[in-house]
Amino acid sequence: MTAEIAVLGGGAWGTALAQMLASDGQDVLLWARESEVVAEVNADHLNSIYLPGARLAENIKATGEVSDLSAIPTLLVVTPAQHMGAVLKTLPENPRDLVLCSKGIEQDTGRLMNDVAAEACPDSEIAILSGPTFAHEVAAGLPTAVTLACSSREQWERLKPLIARPAFRPYYSDDVSGAEIGGAVKNVLAIACGVVDGLGLGQNARAALIARGYAEMLRFGEALGAQAETLAGLCGLGDLVLTCSSTSSRNFSLGKALGEGRTAADLMADRTTVAEGAYTAPVLAELAEAKGVDMPIVQAVNRIIAGADAQAVVAQLLARPLRAEHESDA
């Protein structure tokens, strides 16, 4: 197999992206850490561990050897955010284009993923693919639109024919950090919406939380230099609406279980898949405080993940002083 594009990460999202890329007949190499995933993809064209029920294209080949990624110019990186840097440092060479598809903030350093990738692969040009996407829908070929934030117009021109498909539409942005911030903050807000659902607080409360959470996303984005129009698009508001309203979201499902009384420690120990928001919440809360950004919903999620009673934390949120909806009206 001579592939022009490879996917690094054999979880649900990585497998779905490989399936989407392979839909036009091009060869796709899928790197997975788990030997059982590699074996099943190659022998049976399935990934029953992470994407059950999806029959994979025969032009997807799986490997567990990073050396097989050598000389492939474009790499979609779909490893868990907290392990991305370590995995990228094992690559035999820096690919021309790294497209980061994981959403999160590095816990130990507070860095966005593009900064982590730039250190690990200094010779690569970095792009961000982010938006309202459920893996099972992308794998099934259902219509999907995403933000593809690129480091240059030249990179966009290279990547769009490789990634765009009739049912998978990337939209160009030059705001790489903004595209990342939307996805990372959204994960934490999705946990909050799940908590509201788990507590049985109703649809009104969820809608209010989405709107006020979006305001927090905008404030944090502004503090880090993101463009407001980026966060109003697919990678911000679009992703927020999708994942704050469905149990198909791992972060929403985690929050729902927290609202129902389970602890974060127990839930994270039981999970096969990663709910990135649980790892992002503590570092996001710390960054917001350090930068003087008011993010009460994010702070509330962080307290609940740390073990605080969800009902009590929500009561504290509802007891906050009344204020103008927009800071410009204050």
Curated annotation (Swiss-Prot):
Please write the reaction equations for the catalytic activity of this protein: sn-glycerol 3-phosphate + NAD(+) = dihydroxyacetone phosphate + NADH + H(+); sn-glycerol 3-phosphate + NADP(+) = dihydroxyacetone phosphate + NADPH + H(+)
The main location is: cytoplasm
A GO term (biological process) for this protein?
glycerol-3-phosphate catabolic process
An example Gene Ontology molecular-function term: glycerol-3-phosphate dehydrogenase [NAD(P)+] activity
Question: Where in the cell does this protein reside?
Answer: Cytoplasm
Q: Which PROSITE patterns match?
A: NAD_G3PDH
Give the residues the record marks as binding NADPH: 13, 33, 103, 135, 250, 274, 276
Record-listed sn-glycerol 3-phosphate binding positions:
103, 131, 133, 186, 239, 249-251
Q: Which SUPFAM superfamilies match?
A: 6-phosphogluconate dehydrogenase C-terminal domain-like, NAD(P)-binding Rossmann-fold domains
Q: Which domain of life is it from?
A: Bacteria
**This enzyme's EC code(s):** 1.1.1.94
Pathway noted in the entry: Membrane lipid metabolism; glycerophospholipid metabolism
Keyword set for this entry?
Cytoplasm, Lipid biosynthesis, Lipid metabolism, NAD, NADP, Nucleotide-binding, Oxidoreductase, Phospholipid biosynthesis, Phospholipid metabolism
Q: Name one GO cellular component term.
A: cytosol
Q: Which residues form the active site?
A: 186
Q: Which InterPro entries match?
A: 6-PGluconate_DH-like_C_sf, 6PGD_dom2, G3P_DH_NAD-dep, G3P_DH_NAD-dep_C, G3P_DH_NAD-dep_N, NAD(P)-bd_dom_sf
Q: Which Pfam families match?
A: NAD_Gly3P_dh_C, NAD_Gly3P_dh_N
Tell me the function of this protein: Catalyzes the reduction of the glycolytic intermediate dihydroxyacetone phosphate (DHAP) to sn-glycerol 3-phosphate (G3P), the key precursor for phospholipid synthesis.
Assigned protein family: Belongs to the NAD-dependent glycerol-3-phosphate dehydrogenase family.
Record-given protein name:
Glycerol-3-phosphate dehydrogenase [NAD(P)+]
Q: Which organism is it from?
A: Erythrobacter litoralis (strain HTCC2594)
